[in-house]
Amino acid sequence: VSRAALLVLADGRFPAGGHAHSGGAEAAVGAGLIRDARDLEEFCRGRLHTTGLTCAALAAAAVCGHDPLALDEAADARTPSPALRDAARRLGRQMMRAARATWPSPRLDALAAARPRGAHQPVVLGLAALAAGLGPEDAAHCAAYETAGGPATAVVRLLGLNPFDATAVLARLAPDMDEIAARAAAAAREGIDALPAASAPLLDIAAEQHAARSVRLFTT
């Protein structure tokens, strides 16, 4: 396993389109739910243990060799918000382009052909991790970090939060990320039916409201 490949995949500069998404943080800021670093930490922790766990498990399952198309259907079933389903597929399409250019793989090619409009991002992330020679825990860690890192970066722009404080939030959440990655990888090894379906209804509702706004900084 290449540790450097893990850093490349988890790097926020990997051109997979994540910079355009706040992971629900913009809607939370607008609703007054995130006002400072403490609020951000609680928001990210809640996101980690719900949608983060689900996404991490889907990514780990792709590395375990489960059918990507079945995983894509499982991701659809676990994403009740139409806006978030659409965003996940658009992010998956962008991730697919970046991954195929970085780590060419027949598995990535096959999924791209089967889902020309994009597969769910966590599934593509898992196949990218597999192509990079990474394991299920690695893919789960990438997904978990992304779950918290996206909102943390967005809130720096949305609130003018000190970047040092945002980074400290991520550091404090490291034990949660490790826990989520371990749980996700363990579930992935048991099969698709064992994958968690944790959800966050408020995030789903906020995503639909956010998508209907005419003026917004982030797509989600």
Model features per residue range: what roles?
Residues 27-32, 47, 51, 62-66, ...:
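Generic structural signal for hydrophobic core residues of well-folded globular domains
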Residues 48, 84, 204-207:
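A generic local secondary-structure boundary/capping motif
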Residues 56, 61, 65-134:
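Internal, conserved structured core segments that host functional sites
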Residues 33, 37-42, 131, 140-220:
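C-terminal auxiliary extensions adjacent to catalytic cores
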